[in-house]
Amino acid sequence: MKNKLLFGILFFIGFGLNGQELYNPQTLYDAPGGVFDLNFVREMDIVFEDPNYHSVLVNSFFNAPSYRIPATLSYNGESYDSVGVRYKGNSTFCLPNDEGNPKVPYNIEMNHFIQAQKLENLKKIKLANAWMDPTFAKEITAANIYRKYLPTPEASLLRLNVQGNYLGLYVNTEAVDKQFLQKQFNEKDGVLVKCDPVQVFCGNNTANGNPDLKWMGADSANYYNSYDVKSDHGWGELMELIEKINFDFDNLGDILNIDRVLWAFAVNSAILNLDTYNGYYVHNYYLYRTEDGLFQMIPWDFDNSFAGAILGWDFFDPMAVYNYDTYGNQYAPNERPLLEKLLDDPYYKKLYNAHLRTVYIESLMDTDAVRASINQLQATAYTAVVQDENKLFSMGQYSSNVEENLWTGLGFGGIMSMINRRNAYLSGLQTMFMPTPEISNMN
């Protein structure tokens, strides 16, 4: 049965459902000077032996997605031989590739060909091209908010040179892999599921899927297009979770860290990251089952935060995105069963409201602090952005999209304009001003 602990203790002390201690980010993130230090723009060089590497990697992206080719990687004065490289992404690969632009996302596996090879203790490097972010700041700004409340991949900026030529400025995003799990949970061998459909944005005849946690029957094959089990096993455990969500909700807390899910939903909603389970598109999360038997929700891929490239999702009323309902009332019944069932429960809805209010107060109300952080990041990145001839947007848009929306083809949400309008919406919710409990005389 779900443990209904004292709400005030949950909100102020930091202990979650089932007695599990909530996440403390201050002890886990990268030390100054490391790969994810935001005070610097790192530089990486990749040299392929095969001069036709690009056509090989483009072909494998569509026909053999896990195929990698060797390259020599240089970073911070060190050279690494025979790293395994493939292209990654979905729309962020397809859109530049369709235009003949070489600035596509990279996935680099340090130990693919040489066992135990690492780059500053990392086995995998994931480079996002910030293709739909004029500011180069949305992924990192969002990650810095998520990490206050959830186990969250780190992100930093990196100059990438390929075959001796500057390809562009990339966002270096931490992989959700065994190293991440060890860092965040002090364990790494549980079931890990990437909740992302298999279809390719520009692929022909690719299967459709939707990781919405609906029950699709007892055959695991029904789930293959919607989920990607990264561990050696896990389909049975995933289906057990989905079955409980849909048919045994009262006992869901026995298998899911519900408090962590509610934190994820709260941050998604507060910063309008609509590429999420309770956003416009259902994806971009992992589920990891820890040794205590609970699945943990892990957010990832934040480039569409602050409305991102989804600003114009409602063609007839594009500004409606700022008032995107925080409780999922815009969805059809059973469209998002986990969200629907949690927020139909009075206790979990109260806990969700508390988390939403916390994110609003701690991370969005002080707009001067948010702006200062973005300005510092952009100042650090400025030269690398100027020299990036493969970027999609102009330097004027690099600056202006921080403060205001950009309408060109798609709508690209401005970071501060989104925060200001979202704050206005959130401040109008009665739940934002409910009195908080006071705790005293605790032994």
Where is each model-derived feature located?
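A conserved alpha-helical element in kinase catalytic cores
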Residues: W131-P151
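Short conserved beta-strand and strand-loop elements enriched in small hydrophobics
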Residues: R68-Y75, L158-N161
